Amino acid sequence: MLTATDRSTAPVRRVRILTAGGTIAMKGDHAQPELDADGLVASVPGLTAFPDLEAITILNKPSAHLTLDDQLRVCRAARDAARRGIGVVVTHGTDVLEETAMLCDVLHDAEAPIVFTGAIRPASAAGADGPANLVDAVSVAASAPAAGMGVLVVFGGEIHHARCARKTDTTSLVAFSSPQTGPLGRVTEGHPTIWSRIPRNPPLDPPKLDKRVPIIPSTAGDDGTLARAALGASPDGIVLGTLGAGHLAPEVLEIWAQAANDIPVVAYCRPERGVVLNATYGYAGSERDLRGTKIIPAGFLSPQAIRMKLLACISAGLDVDEVRWAFSQDDG
């Protein structure tokens, strides 16, 4: 377990806050983005404990307005600062925070940590959670134990890895969880404790994100209509939802198996926990049949995380075999 045992010790790394909008920057009766980076920092007295703190506004949008270009811009700004040894905190709308954080982890290639946080309640609301989350995030970004961990999500006093974090509650102040792994640590009285780490994956550096990668779920009674419609739109890749532990109706599996000969088709399990099995079931359309095709199992990643990673892989020019290898790093 790694912890800051000497609580009088000053932060080991200077921190840069990059703001991208979201609820944490919203005020007023209708909760519109208002606070820029300077305004956000000025509203949180607890940040005075951190010397040489920088704050830069990258964007000021609600999550639903973000584009892939916006997300890539935020991630590059964070990565560039981390390459200079600066700890980074990104404040971000929570609705798609996990997506941008995952993309950032795919790009991140430095030792300094990048930490995402946000808020459930606007800055002007009673009991606003943004200030505490921001102080906790800066504490983690400034700490020695967080070095080399990649991209983290700090929310509600918990520390999660970007590859595992999901928004699992719309209104709880502990809105994020990691169903597959649980949190990696906690922040208590402003001091981070990290009790587990996840191996980092080799980074990618896509020049832009201009590919089409939809998420296509499966349901009982699926007759392949949605699959055929999705493929008719000429996607560059597919994130495929399977039932249980990698199961599909046989006729639907055949459609996706044919598609996987031409484009990357990456499969996830509908349950929030668990991975595509290897050889437990043997009926038609089971995981044995799926793994006998060129469909790529995604391991423990959520569909949103898979999409961001697959977008980065395809946009960086990886072929299907290289994409398969990239996702094998997360496959149980």
What are these regions (language model features)?
Residues 1-80, 254, 273, 297:
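ATP/NTP phosphate-donor binding region
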Residues 2, 9-14, 18-25, 30, ...:
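Accessory alpha-helical/coil subdomains and C-terminal extensions
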Residues 18-20, 90-92, 115-118, 150-156, ...:
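Short beta-strand segments
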Residues 28-31, 101, 126-129, 161-167, ...:
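Short acidic, glycine/serine/threonine-rich loops at helix termini
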Residues 85-97, 233-244:
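Short acidic, glycine-rich surface-loop motifs adjacent to enzyme active sites
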Residues 91-112, 248-257:
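Short Gly/Thr/Asp-enriched flexible loops that form oxyanion-binding sites at enzyme active sites
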Residues 116-188:
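Internal gly/pro-rich beta-alpha loop/helix module
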Residues 250-332:
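ATP/nucleoside-binding phosphotransfer catalytic cores, i.e., glycine-rich phosphate-binding loops
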